[in-house]
Amino acid sequence: MGSRYEIRLSGSGGQGLILMGIILAEAIGIYDGKYVAQTQSYGPEARGGSSKSEVIVSDEEIDYPKAMRLDLLLAMNQKSCDEFYPDLKPDGLLIVDSTFVTQIPTRKAFQVSFTRIAREKFKREVVANIIALGALSLLSPIVSAKAVESAVLARVPKGTEKLNRDALRAGMNAAKRAKEAWTKLEVVPEVPKEDLLDSY
């Protein structure tokens, strides 16, 4: 990792992006022991409006907490992918929720249907953000899976630990398949639905 690593988690209000940013920042800062800054913003609408959370990671104290040139962009809807992709570095990591993102600006993207997995596997769309965190922890070098799990379990309501742990692992499994496809084909196609659901 360089001295600074910039992450933007983006989508619409109601997708749990702010909580996701907080959990990711705590995983990196508390459990992995790096310097971290987390900020967030909402569109003028509440649920359904635009939402983003930024996490800046560094080996030293952070003097500017806003993301400018992204090392990692997670896009949970089409609008955020279109709007923020130009901010991604040429060698940056793009992860999209292919439930909603169908027009992808580069072949070098990891496509995982976070929301569809949440609906079909867990019958709860609310865990899509935790599935996305699991995928991010496997695809990005910036945070360990162990730190993410510890941060998630410290944040979620009592009694939902198993659900959230399973959601994390579902995200990791889906990301592993996407990564294997990338390695094999040098592009990352959508993971077939039947393969995704059979792997949890």
Language-model features: locations:
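Active-site cofactor/cluster-binding pocket
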Residues: M1-Y200
